C-alpha cells in the first residue's frame, strides 16, 4: 500500500546560479559527503539538481517538508551496482519513515536540458 508520494522538478539554471555563486558551500549544504564524492567534474549541475529534486520529493513523501529535524543531510541518494538510484533515510528522516511503517522505498530521477525531476513512493 502506498503511504507516501512526492514529486519535484528543479530548473538546472537555478542550481547553476547557486553553484556559481556559492560553489562548494552550496553543494555541502544540500549533499552528504558520500554524494559529494560522486559529483562529476565535467558537468556537475544535472547531478546536483537531480539530488536536490530527489530530496524535495522525499520530504513531500514523508509529509514533513524540511522540518522536525529532517534536513538535506538526513536524506541520501546513492547508486546500486546497476546504476539505479537508491534513497536512504538517515537520522530524523529514518525515524519518521519507521514511524510511518515504511517497508519499501522507490525513487526515479531524471534530467533533461533545462530541468531535473524526481518521484518518491513510500510503501507499507
From Swiss-Prot:
Catalyses which reaction(s): apo-[ACP] + CoA = holo-[ACP] + adenosine 3',5'-bisphosphate + H(+)
Cofactor section: Mg(2+)
Chain positions recorded as Mg(2+) binding sites: 8, 56
Single Gene Ontology MF annotation: magnesium ion binding
Record keywords: Cytoplasm, Fatty acid biosynthesis, Fatty acid metabolism, Lipid biosynthesis, Lipid metabolism, Magnesium, Metal-binding, Transferase
InterPro entries: 4-PPantetheinyl_Trfase_dom (IPR008278), 4-PPantetheinyl_Trfase_dom_sf (IPR037143), ACPS (IPR002582), Ppantetheine-prot_Trfase_dom (IPR004568)
Enzyme Commission code: 2.7.8.7
GO biological process per UniProt: fatty acid biosynthetic process
UniProt subcellular location: Cytoplasm
Biological role stated in the UniProt entry: Transfers the 4'-phosphopantetheine moiety from coenzyme A to a Ser of acyl-carrier-protein.
Family to which the UniProt record says this protein belongs: Belongs to the P-Pant transferase superfamily. AcpS family.
Protein's name in the database: Holo-[acyl-carrier-protein] synthase
Source species: Maridesulfovibrio salexigens (strain ATCC 14822 / DSM 2638 / NCIMB 8403 / VKM B-1763) (Desulfovibrio salexigens)
Gene: acpS
